[in-house]
Design a protein with these regions (language model features):
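Pre-NBD coupling/linker segments of ABC/ABC-like ATPases
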Residues: 1-9
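A short linear hydrophobic-aromatic micro-motif
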Residues: 132, 262-266, 297-302
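A generic structural signal for secondary-structure junctions
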Residues: 88, 114, 213, 231-234, ...
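ABC transporter nucleotide-binding domains
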Residues: 10-15, 20-216, 220-222
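ABC transporter nucleotide-binding domain
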Residues: 181-278
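Alpha-helix N-cap/helix-start and coil->helix boundary motif
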Residues: 19, 103-106, 202, 227, ...
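C-terminal coupling/interaction segments
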Residues: 2-3, 279-317
Length: 317
């Protein structure tokens, strides 16, 4: 891999023309992707869109039909055990030895890596504290809730201090409390580890990810920063909530606004007005003076932004 350009973040994950076909069926169409180091990257798609296939190819757990992938500068699409030192992986349905305690399980995993006993003990303590399981270190894993098991799964994936962490649908089977705890944990890793998070749950991606890729039927539709994505698909709609004491004055205001050349449409429901504008600069300059001119008191003035769900539904039609 070449050196990153000055002023850009180094790439933690990269792939070129990565694909997977089963006969004529494309599980993943040729994919070119770059994920900056230290970011939380959200890989969003419906069930069956190709998210798990992509992760398996990026981690070397499946062989691609074509293309190559690198994690932390080491190619993963060749049979090279060095690459597995560079990432941690939590599959969608992780398996545990239910008769073990979390300490026993993490020690079992840590023995796969070059750590002596003292190093393993220290790292296990660090991981249990990080994922909030220190108080449960003597309990059997079989008695853990789903959220506790997923947090233990992240601990085992990070036990060897990898620079990259792959999480495949980590919250899909959790209740709301478990999801909240796990998302807080994932968010806390930002800047320390590069996280590649696949999910079909839009709220989770929107909450913790700073960069988002959307995949549909094995094809990557786009990659963008979360805020950039929301801005790119923004609708030019202003919501005005007028004080109810001013309702008798509202009709005259609405009638005048409808005549403005920058107005594409207007709806009014009780004391809330939504104005669809064609020229945002003109609207910003003119609306507030019009409110003052008509003696209206304003409770709320808001440029509406689409939700990630609305963007996703638009793109995945």
């Amino acid at each position: 891999m070449g050196s990153p350009a000055a002023g850009t973040k180094p790439e933690a994950i990269r792939c070129q023309h990565l694909s997977k076909y089963y006969g004529d069926v494309a599980a993943l169409k040729p994919l070119d992707l770059s994920v900056p180091a230290g970011s939380v990257f959200g890989f969003l798609g419906r069930n069956g869109a190709g998210k798990t296939t992509t992760i398996r190819l990026l981690t070397g757990l499946a062989r691609p039909t074509s293309g190559s992938a690198w994690v932390d500068g080491v190619e993963t699409t060749r049979a090279d055990s060095r690459a597995r030192q560079n990432f941690g992986y939590l599959p969608q349905d992780p398996a545990f030895y239910n008769w073990m305690t979390p300490v026993e399980f993490l020690d079992y995993i840590a023995r796969l890596f070059p750590m002596n006993r003292a190093q393993r003990r220290q790292r296990i303590e660090e991981m249990l504290s990080l994922v909030g399981l220190k108080d449960a270190e003597t309990r059997r894993i079989g008695g853990f809730s789903g959220g506790m098991q997923q947090r233990l799964g992240i601990a085992q994936a990070l036990i060897h201090r990898p620079p990259v962490l792959f999480l495949d649908e980590p919250t899909s089977s959790l209740d709301p409390a478990g999801r909240y705890e796990l998302l807080d944990l994932i968010s806390s890793l930002r800047g320390q580890v590069t996280v590649f998070l696949s999910s079909h749950i839009l709220a989770d991606i929107e909450r913790v990810c700073d960069t988002i890729g959307i995949i549909r039927e094995g094809e990557l539709l786009l990659v963008a920063g979360r805020d950039e994505l929301l801005s790119r698909y923004a609708t030019n709609v202003i919501a005005l909530e007028i004080d109810r004491d001013c309702l008798p004055l509202l009709n005259a205001f609405v009638a005048q606004v409808e005549t403005q050349p920058w107005v594409a449409g207007l709806t009014a429901a009780n004391n809330v007005i939504r104005v669809n504008v064609t020229d945002t600069a003109a609207a910003r300059q003119a609306l507030l003076p019009l409110l003052v001119q008509h003696g209206l008191l304003l409770n709320r003035y808001e440029w509406l932004r689409p939700t990630l769900e609305e963007i996703f539904l638009t793109l995945s039609q």
